């Protein structure tokens, strides 16, 4: 959105961003929203109750390691159309929602937004997928959902290093190094995510120490953010600002701990 664009100067080519969150906060949905915002030139504005122009259509690839393609497609259409995802899943639409869904589906079809599944991936798989997107579709924006270990990547790392039982933090750090290298090598923007460790529940400061598996991942990123549910203390602190400006109460807060 415009606020984060102001902080980071947008999705810059040759830059590697990391946005982490606890389970269930919405890492995938936030990433899908960003991918659609870059690749699609229209979006339904609920406040204006009409479709509005959304800039240019930039070639974008969304790489999923957990979600199925149909799940991702549903989330994309829900975001573009402004229709509750539950309505798409149940087929029970309110007035004019079906027309918006049909229009959003056509918009998505005509946009340079490509989805690739990598359920059990290696570093070579990630690299090949990005390179294929660049070669076949001139992709400039890459969304990788999300950094974690897999059996295939553990086997690959063991084979390359000759070291058995390599710690998870080392493997995750190696993935982040390769992703940053790909940013520079192919002049693309990459956004990825990680889970948070349990310390986020009691933390007073939200930074790389909350990243699950390896805080060293943050060494290679150009922007680091943590998404959390807004607490009652947060809402209390914002109460005056919300009332004075007529803002809606936020459900999510974002802490930016690195920005270069």
PLM ranges: what are they?
Residues 1-13:
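Phosphate-handling catalytic cores of nucleic-acid transaction enzymes
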Residues 24, 51, 174-260:
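Phosphate-binding/switch region of NTP-binding enzymes
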Residues 18, 140-143, 191, 225:
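Structural motif
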Residues 12-17, 58:
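Pre-Walker A (Motif I) flank of P-loop NTPase domains
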Residues 112-185:
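Phosphate-binding/switch loop-helix module in NTP-utilizing enzymes
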Residues 22-23, 65:
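P-loop (Walker A) phosphate-binding loop of NTP-binding proteins
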Residues 30-34, 72:
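Hydrophobic positions on the alpha1 helix immediately C-terminal to the Walker A/P-loop
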Residues 5-6, 41-138, 208:
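Cytosolic-facing regulatory segments adjacent to core modules
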């Amino acid at each position: 959105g415009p606020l984060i664009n102001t902080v980071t100067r947008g999705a810059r080519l040759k830059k590697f961003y990391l946005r982490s969150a606890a389970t269930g906060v919405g890492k995938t949905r936030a990433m899908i929203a960003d991918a659609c915002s870059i690749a699609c030139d229209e979006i339904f504005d609920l406040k204006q109750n009409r479709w509005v122009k959304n800039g240019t259509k930039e070639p974008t690839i969304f790489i999923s390691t957990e979600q199925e393609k149909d799940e991702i497609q549903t989330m994309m259409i829900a975001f573009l159309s402004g229709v509750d995802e539950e309505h798409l899943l149940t087929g029970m639409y309110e007035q004019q929602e079906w027309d918006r869904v049909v229009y959003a589906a056509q918009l998505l079809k005509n946009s340079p937004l490509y989805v690739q599944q990598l359920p059990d991936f290696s570093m070579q798989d990630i690299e090949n997928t990005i390179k294929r997107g660049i070669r076949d579709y001139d992709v400039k924006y890459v969304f990788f959902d999300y950094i974690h270990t897999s059996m295939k990547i553990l086997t690959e790392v063991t084979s390359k290093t000759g070291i058995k039982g390599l710690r998870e933090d080392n493997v995750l750090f190696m993935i982040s190094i390769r992703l940053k290298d790909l940013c520079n090598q192919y002049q693309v923007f990459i956004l990825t995510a990680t889970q948070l460790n349990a310390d986020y529940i009691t933390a007073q400061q939200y930074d790389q120490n909350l990243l699950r598996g390896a805080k060293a991942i943050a060494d290679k990123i150009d922007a680091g953010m943590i998404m959390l549910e807004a607490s009652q203390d947060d809402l209390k602190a914002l109460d005056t600002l919300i009332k004075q400006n007529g803002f809606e109460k936020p459900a999510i807060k974002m802490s930016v701990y690195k920005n270069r």
